[in-house]
Amino acid sequence: MTVQKLKLMTIVGTRPEVIRLSEVIKKCDRYFDHYLVHTGQNYDYELNQIFFEDLDLRQPDEYLDVAGGSLGESIGNVIARSYDCLRRVRPDALLILGDTNSCLSAIAAKRLHIPVFHMEAGNRCFDECLPEETNRRIVDHIADVNLCYSEHARRYLNAEGTARERTYVTGSPMAEVLSAHWDRIVGSDVLDRLDLQKGGYLLLSAHREENIDDEGNFKALMEAVNALARRYELPVLYSMHPRSRKRIEERGFSFHPLVRAHKPLSFTDYNNLQMNAFCVVSDSGTLPEEAAYFNAKGHPFPAVCVRTSTERPEALDKGAFVLGSLTTERVLQAVDMTVAMLSDGVAASVVPDYRDENVSAKVVRIIQSYTSIVDKMVWRKG
């Protein structure tokens, strides 16, 4: 008797989603009839293609090309084109991760009565100005099964009234991703290629909408970057998102000579640069998880997040990183302190939610377990 596998569609749209889901995608390819879709929300070689290659991922089955002339058009395209794709492919379930506009494909799946599984559910920074916070709240309450990174996230969802019986803590997928590529990360020759010395540079990544598009935040952050170069007299390697580069060029901002703008780096190169940096200064959501993992592996690095809020309280609980705010004074204080702490041997505690290296297996099993339950209990199918 031939048994057909469950048909799953996974929708991604940005580099962080591709990275976080990389090991999950491989498991889904193995155990499901898996259809991988890229919305094209952020698509160019540096931001996506290089990561598919670096993470040993196959190409998506379909690109939706949702980028429009305005934010409203792009969001509309995500919903409309994912609706058409879902209706044509007819998957048994949809998997999405995170809080980008690509996750709004959950709206289309819900209208088509397709069970929605949402990874990274329940993250909250409680800053209503951020578009990601809006997306999180929408998708968490649309999803049929929420897969959280931490007990913090599960408690937030429970307090908001989501179904307790369909909310699970899987842990962060980043430990599994980093573990899978650990030898290549450690063995990268990126320092030689960029003529950098271990501990002799700062690594910078800043691309969030609130930091780049807001004029006041942009000015404060860029002034802080130049202040870092002046204070430490070390190269500041800025891994620059194309959108950030465009905004910087439009404003005609001039960097200190020690600030080196660089196109987005590969996953393995960037993480090698993190583990060898004097300090990492970033607004990336993965910074707390990466810092926690490297600390647990015996390769701690000073990590400063240039934001005023975080959706990773479980990492802040354990001292895995420091919120540096955006003002020059606060950023310099945070860098000084984290560097001094590492020099003094003051280590962060282990973050339990960031240690599991079998998150992909958990996700696959939960999807297999709950698709038919959602069909029956929510949609009254069968």
Predicted regions and their residues:
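Nucleotide-activated sugar donor-binding and catalytic core shared by glycosyltransferases
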Residues: M1-L234, S244-G382
